[in-house]
């Protein structure tokens, strides 16, 4: 069946041009790149763009500190960013900068359209002002004592120690992070985007499928608290674009940053014959537009950005695909504190294809955080890519090149087995489309297991010792090569360099449609090592090279732990510990890991969800009072913890066969327990 060609534009969030790319950034760019490469492999017309977010007070001040012009600094940063993305095989069609002629023209055009359509207001506000530097201070350039937990040296918008958010004017003893002086309040006139005018449109759009269910629910909470006008102004001195007809006033970076998607695409159109900007951005465009972003900037992309596009007469995104954060060995990464492994540090020590594969193996369409467990990383890549995939080719290619001059058998000896691998492509393609790369890899590796089992059972190395077995050995090894070819095609979007080396070995381009016909009578090239096993010493070297930044996090972690300890004491005051029990009493409780295979609302029940739990071979039904905190869609496919030996209890709505464990005071603040990566349904919790 011929696939209808789609016109697609894909963007990644724009990295800020004041520091290096780290492995947290790289998750998003790898995720988007895999999806883009898959669409290209399927024959669609797709364009993949990005740019540096190059404006704002932090860039202006850092350039001053370095004694260079902001334009020189952002040019150097852009070069390093492009080098890192290239190193990780991110296949952008265009990488640009928000500090560009295209972006300035589009920002002014959109602002004027919003103003003429009645969506811009102005009013006088009071802000903190540094009297020494004679500049208004953004929240992150005010530091002081947290008004909630009293932790010192916190930023003016949120506390790293306790997580509280607040206004800089609420801080205790605020100081300018620029000069150290005590800021004063000063009036200034600012322009505002009237977001509340778009509430009805946004309520429809956010529920249209443009957002993941979790994000749509989160946006629903913001509607409940009420939308507010957005300040789109910054006062001089500021590095950015001056607002038309407003000398000394500049666009806040969050206005011209998302417009940078359009600016980068406009730059691509201007240098690409036949590529028309309006075909992708005009209001009635039939093209698809996808933004890949992190969950920290959902507010901007789910409310502000679609409203700006609507108000200025442009199309809205088809979907905003949100991912979680990256942790390393369970520890939070923090860009502001410098506690990250830089992309360049990784590239100095390890193959980027390894991280691409590992990220893909853990990426789903949900917004869960992803932990880069370095021990698991080593084991997973070596087991899957080396032992299962590459080994399939290496153990069969030798016979073909040595005994048959590289020529494959003239026919496929196991046509049904080959067809089963081709048929699996339908579900694998659907999983790629849905961005559920983890499940796609599980299906591909299950096929790899079948292929290796086939070779193990046929044992061509033993058969080759028997007289008159030449044809049979050639058929078996040719089958192994053909199955490798199918597997490598499915993995081509994830590990493109390995795919390219495999194409050289197979003397054929890996193509989703072409593999439907097996290779017969085809000559392959001599097998060369396709992939290097991860050496744990190289992982250690990468960690050692990042030690300076990782060590810097220890003091912050200790401070955060102290704040969490204080918070824990507060929780104990609310609900004291239960009376002590002995071990034998505790051991009577059988806690098990359970997979939530199905979750559904219970008619006429305000608090209950009906959960179907898989205990690794046994299925249980449990009614849980967590409806106020979770939708069924958020729960399906997740692991949780249940009391497995609790006596069944007949309820009004059915029989409940256990209990899932959760914490929190109730309402939206209920949190079910999730086992760590590697836990399996049915495992007992000790």
UniProtKB/Swiss-Prot annotation:
Residue ranges of the motif 'KMSKS' region: 332-336
Per the database record, which ranges form the tRNA-binding domain? 585-686
User: Binding of Zn(2+): at which residues?
Assistant: 146, 149, 159, 162
Task: State the UniProt keywords alphabetically.
Answer: Aminoacyl-tRNA synthetase, ATP-binding, Cytoplasm, Ligase, Metal-binding, Nucleotide-binding, Protein biosynthesis, RNA-binding, tRNA-binding, Zinc
Record InterPro entries: aa-tRNA-synth_I_CS, Anticodon_Met, Met-tRNA-synth_bsu_C, Met-tRNA_ligase_1, Met-tRNA_synth, Methionyl/Leucyl_tRNA_Synth, MetRS_core, MetRS_Zn
| UniProt EC number | 6.1.1.10
- Reaction(s) the record says it catalyses: tRNA(Met) + L-methionine + ATP = L-methionyl-tRNA(Met) + AMP + diphosphate
Highest taxon of the source?
Answer: Bacteria
- Where in this protein would one find the motif 'HIGH' region, according to its record? 15-25
> A single GO CC term, please?
cytosol
Matching entries from Pfam families are given as:
Anticodon_3, tRNA-synt_1g, tRNA_bind
Q: Where in the cell is it found?
A: Cytoplasm
Cofactor annotation remark: Binds 1 zinc ion per subunit.
Q: How does it assemble?
A: Homodimer.
Instruction: Give the protein's function.
Output: Is required not only for elongation of protein synthesis but also for the initiation of all mRNA translation through initiator tRNA(fMet) aminoacylation.
HAMAP family cross-referenced by the UniProt entry = Met_tRNA_synth_type1 (MF_00098)
Protein name listed in UniProt:
Methionine--tRNA ligase
Q: Which organism is it from?
A: Psychromonas ingrahamii (strain DSM 17664 / CCUG 51855 / 37)
Name the gene for this chain: metG
